[in-house]
A protein has these predicted regions:
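N-terminal capping/small domains of soluble enzymes
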Residues: 1-100
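Alpha/beta enzyme core
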Residues: 32-38, 42, 99-206
Length: 206
């Protein structure tokens, strides 16, 4: 057995410790990760809004008192560059209202990062922008995004909230569409749901 087969890897890179920093809008950026880089193996920065619809939603949410990022692709590139040379495997948590928005990001940064689709946010402006939990309720649209990113040859993660829909069905659909990672929020359901998802697909679970 090769040594690489005995250790966890994400996006083809070794994970030094199985602790991952999750995205928190307006909070988890490169500086946040650097301050904690000695203690984590991977990190997802963002969420970042990719198009007019999601940027408008983020602005509305910010005006309501939530923290949000306003970074465009150039600013995201700067964040990625700040983490060059670290041993933290990096992912971007992304919000887009169309498949094309995700593909544009993938063509900007290629396989330097993991692309995490935000199917998690339950704020109404983001749902109305056809993002976040909208994608859980409309899994055909979510799987279209996964397939498009997979076709670009990049590593695809989906951040989801357990218990919103049939988790086992969704896990199987995302696996078939080409997802590599499921990032599951168990806050509302408890840890027992993870076994159901694990038994439904062979994807890496966070």
């Amino acid at each position: 057995m090769h040594a690489s087969n005995r250790f966890l890897s994400l996006n083809g890179k070794p994970v030094k410790t199985p602790v991952v920093l999750a995205s928190m809008a307006g909070i988890t950026n490169a500086e946040y990760v650097l301050q904690r880089s000695s203690h984590v193996g991977a990190a997802f920065i963002g969420g970042y809004s990719l198009d007019d619809a999601t940027r408008s939603a983020a602005k509305e949410m910010k005006e309501a008192g939530r923290t949000e990022f306003e970074d465009d692709l150039d600013a995201i590139a700067t964040e990625i560059a700040m983490l060059d040379g670290t041993d933290v495997v990096l992912g971007l948590n992304l919000r887009g209202s169309t498949t094309d928005a995700y593909v544009a990001a993938a063509r900007e940064f290629w396989n330097s990062v993991i692309y995490e689709i935000d199917a998690h946010c339950r704020q109404q402006p983001m749902i109305e922008a056809h993002c976040g939990e909208y994608l859980l309720q409309n899994s055909d649209a979510l799987c279209d995004i996964v397939r498009a990113l997979h076709a670009e040859g990049v590593c695809v993660s989906v951040k989801m909230r357990a218990g919103v829909v049939d988790d086992r069905r969704l896990a199987r659909e995302l696996w078939a569409a080409g997802a590599d990672i499921l990032h599951v929020d168990l806050m509302d359901t408890g840890y027992t749901r993870i076994r159901q998802i694990r038994n439904s697909c062979p994807l890496i679970l966070i």
